[in-house]
UniProtKB/Swiss-Prot annotation:
GO terms for cellular component: cytosol. Monomer. InterPro entries: aa-tRNA-synth_I_cd-bd (IPR045462), aa-tRNA-synth_I_codon-bd_sub2 (IPR020751), aa_tRNA-synth_I_cd-bd_sf (IPR008925), Glu-tRNA-ligase_bac/mito (IPR004527), Glu-tRNA-synth_I_codon-bd_sub1 (IPR020752), Glu/Gln-tRNA-synth (IPR000924), Glu/Gln-tRNA-synth_Ib_cat-dom (IPR020058), GluQ/Sye (IPR049940). It is found in: Cytoplasm. ATP binds at residue 257. This is Glutamate--tRNA ligase. It catalyses: tRNA(Glu) + L-glutamate + ATP = L-glutamyl-tRNA(Glu) + AMP + diphosphate. A motif ('KMSKS' region) lies at residues 254-258. Its EC number is 6.1.1.17. Gene3D superfamilies: 1.10.10.350, Glutamate-tRNA synthetase, class I, anticodon-binding domain 1, HUPs. Its main location: cytoplasm. GO terms for molecular function: ATP binding; glutamate-tRNA ligase activity; tRNA binding; zinc ion binding. It comes from Corynebacterium efficiens (strain DSM 44549 / YS-314 / AJ 12310 / JCM 11189 / NBRC 100395). The gene is gltX.
Length: 493
């Protein structure tokens, strides 16, 4: 069997889209599963839209997710260069061979002339090119040249139906009349994507083309071009195709770059970790088993086969992504989670980098099983680094927990904590349990709700006693007294 060679070949425009990254993941996983190679090349021939910033973003995305490649940009390989903008001479050479072999021909017809011929024949004028220039005589060509016309170059499409066995969709067929001769080079001689993409695949000996469903209609043209490239000695084989299902967004519409959920880096900013993102993207068209949604990247690679990918559209579900991410956060060793959380808070929030390491380790331990994203870690811990006078109580939580009935547990809690000699979690818990649960006979939810809101500003926080230890005696008592003074709580007008 020929060694598998797959490619990921994005254009450097905008920010990485989750659908694009899903394509990269499936190519990477297939290469790793089969022991093949992933080639990462850049299709940067659109000078008006391409940017070095977007190129850097693609590298960042691949590196963040751990999707390494065997040949391509930045790492090199036997088929350098791996950016289309640097391969113009190669494309011109192949185009010349196609012209010399009669595989492509000059077409001088304007769009208006094509439409007029359709009208004259009683056909829909928007049918597209009619292959008229295939049979131009030398005299006709000379006349067009004398007019100053510059031809585009079109590939002669064989007049046949097109069938192939798609790795995802099974047998696919396009009728011959749907595939007119297509342009491979502009009138200025510049080769188009329709030529350079298959040429790169041919020269880089790509065996499997795994790409989005939106490119399915172009497959007959590409197969025809591969056959022409084989006849002129440029290609050795026609690759096998597999077209991955659309990723759908809200309202069952295809997820577009305008949808916030499509932005990979926004998910990173929101605290999705690579393991969670890879797991979730893997489920967009594939599954490990009917009853297992959580898997490691190693399990994914070991079990992934492109033949198991489903053809039906996959819907992007933010809540499911976050639930899967939560599982992967919990699976991290405590020390690694602490490092990830610290790095996230440092890059994306105002959490102070000089917060004591021992206290941060304790705090990280408290939130690891309570968050779905790293960003939620900030939400749970920010009260620890907020000045007492700057703490703002969540209005809904304060209205619910700082009613008239909260005065008694607040007073008792303050008195009990003032008497604690050594400020530790066990001592704090013992003092509050004795004062509020045993002596006042309150249920824990009633007893501690007001205290939690008072010290954290929120109804949800890390465990109360541990939070008080982290906050310290002075800040804890200052906040409790401030909340007591504001009880019963009245929302600001």
């Amino acid at each position: 069997m020929t060694d598998v060679r797959v490619r990921f070949c994005p254009s450097p425009t905008g920010t990485p889209h989750v659908g694009l990254v899903r394509t990269a993941l499936f190519n990477w996983a297939y290469a790793r599963h089969t022991g093949g190679k992933l080639i990462f090349r850049i299709e940067d021939t659109d000078a008006a839209r391409d940017s070095e910033e977007s190129y850097a973003a693609l590298l960042d995305a691949m590196n963040w997710l751990g999707l390494n490649w065997d040949e391509g940009v930045e790492v090199g390989g036997p088929h350098e260069p791996y950016r289309q903008s640097q391969r113009s001479d190669i494309y011109q050479d192949v185009l010349k061979k196609l012209i010399d072999a009669g595989e492509v021909y000059p077409a001088y017809s304007t769009a208006e002339e094509v439409e007029e011929r359709h009208r004259a024949a009683g056909r829909d004028p928007k049918l597209g090119y009619d292959n008229y220039d295939r049979t131009l005589t030398e005299d006709e060509i000379t006349a067009f040249e004398a007019e100053g016309r510059k031809p585009v170059w079109r590939l002669r499409m064989p007049e046949q139906d097109w069938k192939w066995n798609d790795l995802v969709r099974g047998e696919v067929e396009f009728k011959s009349f749907t595939q007119p001769d297509f342009v491979v080079a502009r009138s200025n001689g510049q080769p188009l994507y329709t030529l350079v993409n298959p040429v790169d695949d041919a020269l880089m000996e790509i065996t499997h083309v795994l790409r989005g469903e939106d490119l399915l209609p172009s497959t007959p043209r590409q197969i025809a071009l591969y056959e022409a490239l084989k006849r002129i000695g440029v290609a050795k084989q026609t690759p096998v195709f597999g077209h991955l299902p659309f990723v759908m967004g809200e309202g069952n519409k295809k997820l577009s770059k305008r949808d916030p959920q499509s932005d990979l880096f926004q998910h990173r900013t929101n605290g999705i970790i690579p393991e969670g993102m890879l797991n979730y993207l893997g489920l967009l068209g594939w599954s490990l088993s009917a009853d297992q949604d959580i898997f490691t990247v190693e399990e994914f690679v070991a079990n992934f086969d492109i033949a198991d990918v489903l053809g039906n559209p996959a819907r992007f579900d933010q809540k499911k992504l976050e639930a899967i991410n939560a599982d992967h956060i919990r699976l991290l060793p405590a020390g690694e989670f602490e490092e990830r959380l610290r790095a996230h808070l440092s890059e994306f929030t105002d959490f102070p980098e000089d917060y004591p390491a021992e206290k941060f380790s304790f705090a990280a331990e408290l939130v690891q099983t309570r968050i779905k994203t790293l960003a939620e870690g900030y939400d749970l811990l920010k009260f620890l680094v907020t000045a007492d006078e700057d703490l703002v109580l969540d209005e809904k939580a304060a209205k619910k927990n700082l009613k008239e009935a909260a005065i008694e547990p607040l007073d008792a809690g303050i008195n009990a904590l003032e008497a604690v000699a050594e400020w530790t979690t066990p001592n704090i818990e013992a003092a509050l349990t004795r004062a509020l649960i045993e002596e006042l006979g309150l249920k824990p939810r009633v007893a501690y709700g007001a205290l939690r809101v008072a010290i954290s500003g929120a109804a949800v926080s890390p465990p109360l006693f541990e939070s008080m230890e982290l906050l310290g005696r002075e800040s804890t008592l200052t906040r409790l007294r401030a909340a007591r003074a504001a009880t019963p709580y009245q929302a600001a007008e």
